[in-house]
C-alpha cells in the first residue's frame, strides 16, 4: 500500500446521491504472473493461496487511527464500518492496471473501512478523514464537496 499523505480534493456531487467513502483500505489485484491468477472464489485450488492473499491486505484491520468529520461533526463508531477480506473479480479496460490488455483480474482481495451515508443537503460541505493502518501508513484527506 502506498502512503497517502495529506491531500485536499474539490468534488461536485449530484443532489440526492448517497456517498460511499473509503476511510482506509488495502487491495490486492492479481495479475497474470501470480500463481493464483484466474482462480475464482469457490475454486478448490484457491484455498492454498487464500492465506497468502489475505496477508497482503490484513494490515488495515484493526486501524490505529480512524476519524471522519462531516462539516466539523465527528462520526462515531467507525470501527463498525469494517469490511474484512472480501474476494472479488475486477474487469479492467485495455491500458488499465499495469498497462494490461483488457482482462478480468481474479482473485482479488480487499480489506478496509468504508462509510456510507445518506445524501447531503445541497450546498457546500467539508468531509475530513484521517486514518492509519497497522503498518503506520497514514492518510489525511479533506474533501470540499459541492452538492447539487
Would you name each region that the model predicts?
Residues 61-124, 130-148:
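Extended, well-structured beta-strand/loop surface patches
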Residues 2-91:
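Extracellular-facing segments of soluble proteins and assemblies that are Gly/Ser/Thr-biased and enriched
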Amino acid at each position: 500500500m502506498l502512503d497517502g499523505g495529506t491531500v485536499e480534493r474539490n468534488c461536485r456531487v449530484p443532489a440526492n446521491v448517497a456517498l460511499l467513502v473509503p476511510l482506509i483500505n488495502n487491495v490486492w489485484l492479481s495479475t497474470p504472473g501470480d500463481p493464483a491468477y484466474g482462480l475464482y472464489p469457490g475454486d478448490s485450488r484457491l484455498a492454498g493461496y487464500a492465506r497468502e492473499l489475505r496477508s497482503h491486505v490484513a494490515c488495515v484491520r484493526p486501524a490505529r487511527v480512524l476519524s471522519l468529520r462531516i462539516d466539523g461533526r465527528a462520526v462515531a463508531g467507525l470501527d463498525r464500518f469494517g469490511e474484512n477480506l472480501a474476494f472479488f473479480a475486477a474487469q479492467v479496460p485495455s491500458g488499465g492496471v499495469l498497462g494490461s490488455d483488457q482482462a478480468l483480474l481474479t482473485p482479488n482481495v480487499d480489506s478496509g473501512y468504508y462509510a456510507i451515508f445518506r445524501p447531503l443537503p445541497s450546498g457546500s460541505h467539508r468531509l475530513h478523514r484521517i486514518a492509519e493502518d497497522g503498518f503506520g501508513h497514514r492518510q489525511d484527506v479533506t474533501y470540499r464537496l459541492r452538492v447539487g
